[in-house]
């Protein structure tokens, strides 16, 4: 059968001998050749039909080879005949196109076959599915690359043939495949042949609009707030960079703006500059600790930061330093930069993310081109940090490049002067010689002969050190008040011959065992931060190792507790992140368990105190780990002592309340992957579990996620309810996020019957009075089955007798500390029930409070902090709740004991413990004046544990936090007045709060709904807490000057002008840019890890504290950019927009929802409803365009602010976009411009939403189709101006984000759209052309005219094919038909372009000038027709 096809071809190509002989005189009939060609085509169809299906590809290949060898006329006939095979369904159009393009003879040198091949493809490609068209287009694109750049004019027709088929495919009106696919393919292999470059680039340029709709305005200028918490993956999606290129990771190939495709070096450098940023850097770049991979981009930025620090140092004089135990060293910003860089360098080199050797080489290369000398010692100091700690474990070859830095940085021919040994700057100046000594020692150990001489500049330094380590000098050395011993430790930390003696002296000084020259005992000395900063990392590690070793020995021997100076110094050492493995990690994993194992209760108590009151910026996972450890330790019988148990609970309370809102959910869910949910919840303490739930509620509210309950959270809550069943009052549930509210509403425990409780207490009291035998009394009340009502009974005894009998003492001693908590809960319930039901009123409640105060202060039965915490967390409704709060007020304020202690403690003490050397002396004197007892009789069985860092005031502080919150929840005026009284007397205690601004932020955020209508209470809260620091902080440390004036005024109302909001945003923007707007502080001991974080939280506190409605505050913040655009320096505009986004995203929903209100206003502007601008929508929505061309800016500026807000939002807040789009913005949309504006709003965040909330993207996509249908119907018969851009965006969503998830929903809507939209979107639903045409005729006959005017060539071909039977076609008719179709296609394109002006790739300002655009299009069409006619004439002459 295969030979039949070839025979048919040969028969057609055979030339009769007579014809050949008389060719010059024979006259042929007019239609002979056409009839012959028709017969051949029919015979070919018959012959091919007889070929087996599996052999047709091979036969077709042979046919094409035979055709390629024919003459010009015969090639045309042979190729044209192949169309018949496709029309007759003998072969598929896809197979034909593939075989033609793969034909070995297809070469542009073979002109006729090349041209006819591409003409053939053009004729049949309309019958190829879009995937096949995509592959054909790629092959055609690649074939064009065969032509040389300096192509000969004789090859131009062949190149034009390729261009013609590509133009045909690219023509959107033909709808052969989604234009999105075309752009995706042609963007990758640039550049193209110059003849096609215009075609390709013009098509790609059309997708600038799609790229604009999915690009964040000012993305490259956005900067984050770097907090120290453990980052969850979804919190970093906004800031992720490719770790090799430092570029943003965009989905899809689109022509984004150049700045979005550049390396984001400023972003990484900014983050690296921030203290406590290493975790964010690791998440940004997706650094994997276990892979030990070197990241060149990170390495380069570290080098740049070091060079920048040297430049900063060059512009400033060298620091003089501070004395040995200076309490408050003034460190300049650039010196902080060096301290921070040292920590960063060690971390990234330690985990092998960067190479130390390559960093040194890069530094040498950069510094060799610069004249920087002032910072050379600082550079050597940070190199010394790493060298001293790692040189013993690494070969000397890794450090040899450092010698090149010596040659470069120390070229002096005279020795440098020795620095002042009494100043801390001395250790920096001596760092070069310390580095030299470490390197030379390592070389000797490895037997490497380094002949390099000592730099002359360092000769004096070397001689001085050599003198210090002589035997005589070492033996007579004492610590003194200079830095010589520190220097020896730094220089010889790897040389045990010289290192042991100075390290021993440091330990002796801390332990108080040092001797003066005359033999006297020297008191223990706490090392200042200045001294610790002067030690290298290796020396710090050795020191902390010595501390831990000593404490472990003391724990094993149950000996004395370490000296206070040593513990204070140990706590200060734990703040250094570069020694984390030996520091906080060793503290939790080694020291604490060993101390507990050896039952060294005094040391355990002291270590927990130290953790509570001395440690800062402890990573969250360590705090969760300690919380779990505390719960496991507290369940051991040996720890069931009053003072130790109180310390456990107090430490756990501080741990729980200190967990940040953004930290709680990711850290706990991660922790529960390995541990049971009960690991961080208490099995016995209802109060701790209640605070844990309140902290979870706050986290859900502030950070988001309160609308749905995650799996780990349900397990966590059910575990709590199982071990400590409890209920919540309605006023607390009202503040809970919806998910928590629903959970506790369903799982609420029934309240205890108060009458039964009172009856049980009366029975116990009768039992007490009726029994006379002491042993019987003790046995009865210590029996496990007895109700835990002894504190209730004791209350009645003291009420009656004002004394406690010895029997009661013995019973209390028999009740364990944890069991006493159960008694306390019953007592609190009983107390409230008694007062609430009493008819005696004021006298009764006062006597009750006096009795409780006696129990607390006189008889030491319970402590004030435990009683108040328990009372505050009990579940009471209505009148009982008010009674409970009244009791709390009287407990705190009626008696003077607590108030006196608070006033005395706050007057004589300063919370900046790291600046003090005499904290212990002051604290000891306070305890002597106000001694604390933790038992009725501190006998031998209850030996008091030493107290170094805590007291009743500090323990009460987290309880006061809880009390304030509980008072706010009960929205009754007199309750809030009581809170005001409490703050008046006790707010001074907030001076010692380690997170006062964070506490204010959380309070104002969580209770925003309640406080919104209570400006006086907000003012009271902010004023009371911030004023507590008035004596120890500079005036500008927190709130702004105008707000401070408001706090000091009597009026509770104030409506600030726009300039006020502008100043707040300027302050934040300046801080982020690096200006020192606030006070200088040591961020290692601060509430916040860096200045921008501090600036954000104080700004939010101030805005939340304003007596202004949230929508008005939000509107003013947006107007800072919209109305203040003209007065903001243009170089700073993006930093201001970034700052507004940061602030709004950090405020509660009533504030950040204001951006949706403003977007709604934009959609409803008259010009959106009736576009009258002469600029098209994409121009006016482009921030860069309106800024540079000075056009109407409102739309673009509001978009920029919205993008900034959404970019800084967390995942849960961003996911609310679907709801706001549906409820607030969708009802406004009627026009194309509104639809495009809406696409600009959510388009840039689809990628993030897909990562964080995958199902949400599908919901947004369905909304978009619904809005498109509304717009389509609203426009009626009028053509859509932006149809192609909208379709491109829909294809982007389908192929990048949703796939076929919404296929059914989208298909139903697309079928209801106008035919032109259906045509363009048919690849989303796979609609047939017949369905599109037929459905629309049935649907709306009025659209027939539009359909006929805008019908595409593909539709025309499809409709004409049935009208002309293939058996009657002649060759001439085919040519005429083809020409007619081309002319019709040109006319249709011209008509369609007139009807719907394309906005893609049009000049600025052309959007409104339709007449001018039509003239341009007509001229372009005339030129195209002329070129096609010229090409046709050339082809005819050639043939």
Swiss-Prot record:
Residues 1348-1372, 1411-1439 have a biased composition (Low complexity). Pfam families: Med23. Signal peptide: none annotated. Keywords: Activator, Coiled coil, Nucleus, Transcription, Transcription regulation. Its main location: nucleus. The keyword Ribonucleoprotein does not apply. Residues 1338-1372, 1401-1439 are annotated as: Disordered. One of its GO terms (cellular component) is mediator complex. It is found in: Nucleus. Residues 358-625 are annotated as: Interaction with Hsf. One of its GO terms (molecular function) is transcription coregulator activity. Residues 282-318 form a coiled coil. The keyword Iron-sulfur does not apply. GO terms for biological process: positive regulation of gene expression; regulation of transcription by RNA polymerase II. Component of the Mediator complex, a coactivator involved in the regulated transcription of nearly all RNA polymerase II-dependent genes. Mediator functions as a bridge to convey information from gene-specific regulatory proteins to the basal RNA polymerase II transcription machinery. Mediator is recruited to promoters by direct interactions with regulatory proteins and serves as a scaffold for the assembly of a functional preinitiation complex with RNA polymerase II and the general transcription factors. Required for transcriptional activation in response to heat shock. Belongs to the Mediator complex subunit 23 family. Component of the Mediator complex. Interacts with Hsf. This is Mediator of RNA polymerase II transcription subunit 23. It comes from Drosophila melanogaster (Fruit fly). The gene is MED23.
């Amino acid at each position: 059968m295969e030979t039949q096809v070839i025979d048919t071809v040969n028969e057609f190509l055979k030339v009769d001998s007579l014809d050949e002989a008389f060719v010059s005189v024979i006259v042929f009939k007019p239609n002979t050749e056409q009839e012959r060609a028709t017969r051949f085509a029919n015979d070919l169809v018959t012959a091919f039909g007889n070929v087996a299906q599996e052999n047709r590809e091979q036969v077709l290949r042979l046919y094409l080879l035979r055709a390629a060898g024919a003459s010009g006329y015969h090639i045309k006939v042979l190729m044209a005949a192949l169309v018949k095979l496709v029309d007759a369904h003998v072969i598929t159009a896809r197979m034909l196109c593939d075989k033609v393009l793969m034909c070995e003879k297809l070469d542009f040198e073979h002109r006729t076959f090349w041209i006819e091949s591409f003409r053939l493809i053009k004729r049949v490609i309309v019958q190829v599915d879009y995937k096949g068209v995509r592959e054909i287009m790629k092959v055609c694109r690649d074939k064009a690359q065969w032509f040389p750049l300096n192509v000969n004019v004789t090859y131009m027709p062949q190149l034009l043939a390729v261009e013609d088929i590509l133009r045909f495919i690219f023509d959107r009106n033909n709808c052969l495949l989604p234009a999105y696919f075309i752009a995706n393919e042609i963007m990758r292999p640039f550049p193209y042949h110059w003849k096609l470059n215009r075609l390709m680039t013009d098509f790609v340029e059309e997708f600038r609009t799609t790229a604009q709709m999915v690009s964040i305005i000012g993305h490259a200028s956005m900067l984050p707030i770097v907090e120290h918490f453990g980052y969850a993956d979804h919190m970093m999606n906004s800031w992720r960079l490719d770790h090799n290129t430092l570029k943003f990771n965009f989905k899809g190939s689109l022509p984004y703006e150049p700045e979005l495709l550049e390396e984001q070096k400023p972003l990484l450098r900014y983050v690296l500059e921030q203290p406590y940023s290493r975790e964010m850097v690791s998440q940004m770049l997706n650094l994997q600790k276990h892979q030990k991979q070197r990241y060149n981009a990170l390495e380069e930025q570290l080098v740049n930061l070091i060079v920048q620090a040297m430049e900063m140092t060059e512009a400033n004089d060298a620091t003089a330093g501070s004395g040995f135990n200076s309490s408050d060293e003034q460190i300049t910003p650039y010196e902080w930069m060096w301290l921070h860089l040292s920590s960063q360098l060690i971390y990234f080199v330690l985990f092998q993310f960067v190479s130390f050797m390559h960093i040194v080489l890069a530094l040498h290369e950069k510094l060799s081109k610069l004249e920087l000398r002032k910072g050379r010692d600082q550079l050597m100091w940070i190199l010394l940090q790493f060298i001293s700690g790692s040189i013993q474990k690494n070969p000397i070859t890794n450090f040899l490049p450092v010698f090149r830095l010596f040659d470069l940085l120390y070229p002096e021919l005279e020795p440098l002067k020795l620095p002042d040994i009494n100043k801390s700057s001395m250790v920096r100046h001596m760092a070069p010689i310390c580095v030299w000594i470490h390197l030379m020692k390592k070389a000797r150990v490895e037997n490497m002969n380094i002949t390099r001489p000592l730099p002359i500049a360092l000769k004096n330094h070397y001689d001085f050190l050599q003198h210090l380590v002589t035997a005589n000098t070492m033996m007579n050395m004492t610590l003194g008040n200079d830095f010589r011993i520190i220097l020896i430790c730094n220089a010889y930390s790897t040389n045990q011959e010289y290192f042991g003696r100075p390290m021993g002296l440091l330990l002796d000084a801390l332990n108080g065992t040092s001797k003066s020259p005359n033999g006297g005992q020297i008191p223990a000395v706490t090392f200042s931060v200045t001294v610790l900063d002067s030690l290298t990392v290796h020396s710090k590690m050795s020191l902390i190792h010595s501390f831990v070793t000593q404490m472990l020995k003391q724990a094993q021997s149950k000996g004395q507790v370490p000296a206070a100076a040593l513990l204070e110094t140990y706590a200060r050492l734990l703040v250094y992140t570069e020694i984390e493995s030996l520091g906080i990690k060793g503290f939790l994993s080694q020291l604490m368990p060993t101390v507990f194992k050896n039952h060294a209760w005094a040391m355990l108590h002291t270590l927990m105190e130290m953790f509570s009151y001395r440690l800062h910026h402890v990573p969250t996972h360590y705090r969760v780990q300690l919380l779990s450890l505390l719960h496991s330790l507290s369940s051991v019988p040996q720890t069931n002592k009053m003072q130790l148990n109180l310390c456990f609970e107090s430490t756990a309370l501080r741990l729980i309340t200190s967990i940040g809102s953004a930290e709680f959910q990711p850290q706990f869910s991660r922790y529960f992957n390995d541990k049971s949910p009960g690991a961080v919840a208490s099995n016995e303490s209802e109060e701790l579990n209640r605070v844990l739930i309140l902290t979870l509620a706050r986290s859900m509210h502030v950070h988001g996620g309160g609308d749905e309950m995650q799996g780990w959270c349900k397990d966590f809550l059910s575990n709590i309810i199982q071990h400590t069943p409890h209920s919540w009052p309605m006023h607390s549930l009202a503040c809970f996020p919806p998910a928590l509210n629903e959970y506790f509403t369903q799982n609420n425990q029934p309240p205890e019957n108060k009458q039964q409780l009172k009856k049980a207490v009366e029975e116990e009291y009768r039992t007490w009075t009726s029994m006379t035998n002491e042993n019987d009394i003790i046995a009865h009340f210590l029996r496990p089955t007895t109700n835990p009502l002894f504190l209730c009974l004791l209350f009645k005894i003291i009420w009656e007798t004002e004394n406690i009998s010895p029997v009661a003492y013995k019973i209390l001693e028999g009740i364990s500390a944890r069991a006493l908590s159960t008694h306390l809960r019953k007592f609190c319930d009983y107390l409230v029930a008694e007062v609430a039901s009493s008819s005696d009123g004021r006298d009764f409640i006062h006597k009750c409070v006096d009795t409780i105060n006696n129990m607390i202060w006189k008889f030491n039965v319970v402590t004030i902090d435990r009683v108040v915490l328990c009372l505050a967390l009990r579940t009471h409704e209505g009148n009982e709740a008010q009674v409970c709060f009244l009791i709390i007020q009287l407990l705190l304020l009626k008696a003077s004991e607590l108030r006196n202690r608070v006033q005395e403690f706050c007057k004589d003490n300063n919370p900046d413990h790291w600046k003090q050397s005499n904290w212990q002396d002051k604290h000891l004197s306070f305890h002597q004046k106000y001694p604390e007892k933790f038992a009725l009789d501190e006998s031998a069985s209850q030996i008091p544990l030493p107290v170094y860092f805590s007291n009743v005031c500090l323990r009460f502080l987290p309880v006061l936090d809880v009390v304030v919150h509980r008072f706010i929840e009960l929205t009754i005026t007199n309750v809030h007045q009581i809170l005001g009284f409490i703050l008046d007397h006790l707010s001074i205690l907030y001076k010692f709060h380690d997170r006062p601004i964070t506490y204010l932020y959380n309070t104002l955020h969580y209770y925003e709904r309640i406080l919104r209508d209570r400006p006086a209470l907000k003012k009271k809260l902010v004023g009371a807490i911030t004023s507590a620091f008035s004596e120890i902080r500079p005036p500008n440390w927190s709130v702004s000057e105008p707000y401070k004036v408001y706090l000091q005024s009597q009026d509770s109302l104030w409506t600030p002008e726009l300039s006020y909001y502008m100043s707040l945003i300027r302050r934040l923007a300046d801080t982020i840019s690096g200006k020192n707007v606030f006070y200088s502080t040591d961020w290692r001991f601060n509430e916040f890890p860096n200045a921008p974080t501090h600036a954000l939280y104080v700004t939010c506190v101030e805005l939340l504290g304003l007596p202004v409605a949230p929508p008005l505050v939000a509107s003013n913040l947006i107007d800072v950019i919209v109305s203040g655009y003209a007065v903001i320096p243009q170089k700073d505009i993006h930093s201001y927009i970034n700052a507004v986004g940061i602030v709004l995203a950090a405020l509660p929903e009533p504030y950040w929802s204001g951006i949706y209100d403003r977007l709604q206003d934009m959609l409803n502007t008259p010009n959106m409803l009736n576009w009258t601008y002469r600029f098209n929508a994409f121009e006016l929505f482009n921030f860069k365009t309106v800024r540079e061309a000075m056009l109407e800016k409102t739309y673009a500026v509001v978009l920029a602010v919205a993008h900034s807000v959404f970019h800084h939002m967390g995942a849960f807040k961003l996911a609310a976009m679907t709801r706001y789009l549906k409820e607030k913005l969708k009802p406004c949309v009627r026009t194309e411009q509104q639809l495009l504006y809406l696409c600009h709003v959510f388009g840039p965040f689809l990628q993030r939403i897909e990562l964080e909330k995958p199902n949400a993207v599908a919901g947004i996509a369905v909304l978009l189709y619904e809005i498109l249908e509304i717009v389509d119907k609203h426009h009626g018969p009028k053509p859509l101006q932006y149809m192609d851009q909208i379709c491109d965006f829909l294809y982007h969503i389908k192929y990048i984000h949703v796939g076929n998830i919404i296929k059914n929903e989208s298909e139903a809507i697309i079928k209801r759209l106008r035919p032109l939209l259906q045509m363009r979107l048919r690849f989303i639903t796979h609609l047939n052309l017949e369905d599109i045409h037929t459905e629309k005729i049935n649907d709306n006959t009025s659209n027939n005219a539009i359909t006929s005017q805008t019908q595409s060539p593909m539709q025309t071909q499809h409709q004409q094919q049935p009208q002309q039977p293939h058996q009657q076609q002649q060759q001439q008719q085919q040519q005429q038909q083809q020409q007619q179709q081309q002319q019709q296609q040109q006319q249709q394109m011209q008509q369609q372009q007139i009807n719907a002006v394309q906005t893609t790739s049009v000049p600025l300002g052309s959007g409104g000038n339709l007449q001018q655009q039509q003239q341009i299009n007509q001229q372009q069409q005339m030129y195209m027709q002329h070129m096609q006619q010229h090409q046709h004439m050339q082809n005819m002459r050639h043939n």
